[in-house]
Amino acid sequence: MRKLFFALLLLASGMTAGAQRNIQLHYDFGRNIYSDEEANRHKVELTLEQLNPDKWGCWFYFVDIDLSSHFVESAYTQIFREFNLAEHSPFAFHVEYNGGLNRNTSFQQAALAGFAYNGHSADFTKTWAVQLMYKHFFKSYQYTHSFASAELSVFWALNFAHRKCTFSGITELWRDEKPNGHGCLAILAEPQFWYNFTNHFSIGSEWEFSNNFIHNTNPESTQTFFWNPTLAVKWNF
């Protein structure tokens, strides 16, 4: 599971000068749905997110931590910095790092650079961002190699029912490579729905649709696209 819920973004407005932090705990049903293909998929994930707006733009990071009954199985992070191109401009220069470790090896690291367009409605109940970036994957472990890519990311957040409900999410498209070196289109979409009991506590669900970040454990399966829903709680600090 990979999240960049910058879509919860107050970034679009510079609405607050303070840091925005949340912690999410997800129970993942993917292994129940694909018992053969995702036999090793972890059921519990902890996500930490923080957004720090400032007068130049913002910092953002998240860390996804997969947990089992015995180990911290993996940790994956994305960290980015945006620099506003002008005061009150919706356009920003964007630089980013992706990478992480698991119990046996590592995720292939990548660096990204490009531009972002950030927007919001007058009352900030609707926010969105579009990012178009050059992406470079590095040789990170055995059988990987460096290669050039590009990524398009779209984020959104919609608050309604007097801000009791939030529908937010991300869709990302990028060029990946198959083991034989042939290029392919990688797709990741992660819509989330939250019911906000208070300003701090929410219960909701995330639905992950992806042909990437999946380790198919059934060599005879032809399944390439997966739907992995979760049940989750979130605390906003």
Q: How does the language model describe each region?
A:
Residues 22-27, 36-42, 70-155, 218-228:
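Outer-membrane pore/translocation modules
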Residues 225-237:
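Outer-membrane beta-barrel "beta-signal"
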